[in-house]
């Protein structure tokens, strides 16, 4: 901590030459400290100590920001130099500097605690458009440069880590703001954004109705919901887990939206639409949600592309300077939904029967003690990943025009 104070005292403003990199360099030497859902609950329990949360976050948030800033710096130069990526980078550096100022403040100073909440709100608002702005930077880069397969793979690797980092920092900031802010705007039954008794089926039904409303507006019809729940831990009891309802709703809404669109378009000439079937199962270790549609499915070669940040079936949106930047069209729905699932050690997978339909499966941890943040860390392994060079494929690639062996034998 003394080293951090020395760096602070030696730093002036953001405009000082070479000062910002020293801040980033200092905090990037630390690894992020992942928290479990149980620890996040303890931070917000009745005996929650604002000073403890303050002391943790003023160190942890700069560490997480600095780690991902180091990864931004080793991206292709043409990408880093785009106006969009430069803007995102400036937001992260400014936020890091804002937070580091509190290293000189005492946790016993009530004004410092109050100012810290205000700063977290300011940082959260500043980062509001990070996702579409970074997406725009990728588009600018791809429009200007030819992107080889290895670079494309590295972009996927980076964006997974960048957006997971963003999910984690927003989670920590939201928890502190909701619990310790003077204006109590959260759900009284929640601890911050966490519901200790999350009714999974209720979230499923709400996400379905939200998706259905959009489907009705666009297609003037929508499929029904057929829901089954199986509680393998406590038979005949409702299914509840400790979770973040907004994260679960985000995943479900995206999957229902895709399932409804596929169903309506595939069955447009049918007298009625096949219902979307959902089964929710609580086991000893996992909570599993399977969403099945009869929307015609997708070919196997397309499945991996659906989780690519550079693939979308919607037209590419145009960015403007408003705060309401679009997300549809960037192709980010499924990959970011998968990140939400993976954030607390879960997963999201698609299994498709081309010509029939698709199963989407969400896996979540059933126990809060096992729901631990999955966080990227900038280290030698991460750096090495970006240094991979393009090598020849060690599997035969089928030719689009196979040789005519009969003709060759005749010759």
UniProtKB/Swiss-Prot annotation:
Induction: Up-regulated by prolonged fasting, in glucose-deprived cells and in response to a high-fat diet. Down-regulated by insulin. Up-regulated by PPARD. One of its GO terms (cellular component) is mitochondrion. Its main location: mitochondrion. One of its GO terms (molecular function) is protein kinase activity. Changing residue 161 to A: Loss of activity. Keywords: ATP-binding, Kinase, Mitochondrion, Nucleotide-binding, Transferase, Transit peptide. It is found in: Mitochondrion matrix. The keyword Kinase applies. ATP binds at residues 254-261, 293, 312-313, 329-334. PROSITE patterns: HIS_KIN. Ubiquitous; highest levels of expression in heart and skeletal muscle. GO terms for biological process: cellular response to fatty acid; cellular response to starvation; glucose homeostasis; insulin receptor signaling pathway; negative regulation of anoikis; reactive oxygen species metabolic process; regulation of acetyl-CoA biosynthetic process from pyruvate; regulation of bone resorption. It catalyses: L-seryl-[pyruvate dehydrogenase E1 alpha subunit] + ATP = O-phospho-L-seryl-[pyruvate dehydrogenase E1 alpha subunit] + ADP + H(+). It holds the Pfam family BCDHK_Adom3. Residues 138-368 form the Histidine kinase domain. The record marks 157, 161, 395 as: Interaction with the other subunit in the homodimer. Its EC number is 2.7.11.2. InterPro entries: AK/P_DHK_N_sf (IPR036784), BCDHK/PDK_N (IPR018955), BCKD/PDK (IPR039028), HATPase_C_sf (IPR036890), His_kinase_dom (IPR005467). Belongs to the PDK/BCKDK protein kinase family. Kinase that plays a key role in regulation of glucose and fatty acid metabolism and homeostasis via phosphorylation of the pyruvate dehydrogenase subunits PDHA1 and PDHA2. This inhibits pyruvate dehydrogenase activity, and thereby regulates metabolite flux through the tricarboxylic acid cycle, down-regulates aerobic respiration and inhibits the formation of acetyl-coenzyme A from pyruvate. Inhibition of pyruvate dehydrogenase decreases glucose utilization and increases fat metabolism in response to prolonged fasting and starvation. Homodimer. Interacts with the pyruvate dehydrogenase complex subunit DLAT, and is part of the multimeric pyruvate dehydrogenase complex that contains multiple copies of pyruvate dehydrogenase (E1), dihydrolipoamide acetyltransferase (DLAT, E2) and lipoamide dehydrogenase (DLD, E3). This is [Pyruvate dehydrogenase (acetyl-transferring)] kinase isozyme 4, mitochondrial. The gene is PDK4.
């Amino acid at each position: 901590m003394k080293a951090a104070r020395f760096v602070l005292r030696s730093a002036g403003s953001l405009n000082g030459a070479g000062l910002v990199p020293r801040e980033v360099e200092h905090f990037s030497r630390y690894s992020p400290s992942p928290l479990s859902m149980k620890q996040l609950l303890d931070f917000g329990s009745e005996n929650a100590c604002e000073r403890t949360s303050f002391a943790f976050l003023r160190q942890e948030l700069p560490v997480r920001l600095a780690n991902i800033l180091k990864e931004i710096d080793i991206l292709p130069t043409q990408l880093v130099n785009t106006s969009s990526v430069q803007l995102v980078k400036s937001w992260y550096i400014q936020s890091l500097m804002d937070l580091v100022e509190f290293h000189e403040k005492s946790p016993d100073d009530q004004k410092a605690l109050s100012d810290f909440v205000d700063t977290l709100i300011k940082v959260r608002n500043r980062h509001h458009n990070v996702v579409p702005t970074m997406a725009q930077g990728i588009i600018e880069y791809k429009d200007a440069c030819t992107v080889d397969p290895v670079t494309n793979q590295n972009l996927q690797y980076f964006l997974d880590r960048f957006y997971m980092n963003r999910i984690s920092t927003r989670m920590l900031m939201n928890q502190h703001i909701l619990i310790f802010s003077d204006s109590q705007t959260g759900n009284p039954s929640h601890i911050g954004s966490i519901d200790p008794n999350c009714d999974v089926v209720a979230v499923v039904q709400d996400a379905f109705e939200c998706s259905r409303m959009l489907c009705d507006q666009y297609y003037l019809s929508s499929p029904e919901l057929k829901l089954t729940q199986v509680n393998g831990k406590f038979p005949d009891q409702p299914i509840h887990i400790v979770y973040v309802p907004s994260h679960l709703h985000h995943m479900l809404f995206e999957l229902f939206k895709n399932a409804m669109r596929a169903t309506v378009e595939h069955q447009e000439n049918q007298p009625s639409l096949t219902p979307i079937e959902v089964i929710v199962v609580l086991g000893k270790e996992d909570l599993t949600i399977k969403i099945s549609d009869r929307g015609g499915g997708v070919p196997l070669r397309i499945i991996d592309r659906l989780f690519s940040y550079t693939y979308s079936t919607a037209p590419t949106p145009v960015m403007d300077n408003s705060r309401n930047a679009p997300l549809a069209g960037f192709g980010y729905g499924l990959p970011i939904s998968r990140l939400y699932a993976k954030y607390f050690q879960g997963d999201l997978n698609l299994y498709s029967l081309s010509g029939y339909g698709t199963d989407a499966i969400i896996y979540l941890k059933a126990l809060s003690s096992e729901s631990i943040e999955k966080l990227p860390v900038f280290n030698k392994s991460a750096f090495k990943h970006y240094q991979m060079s393009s090598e020849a494929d060690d599997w035969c690639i089928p030719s689009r025009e196979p040789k005519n062996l009969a003709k060759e034998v005749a010759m």
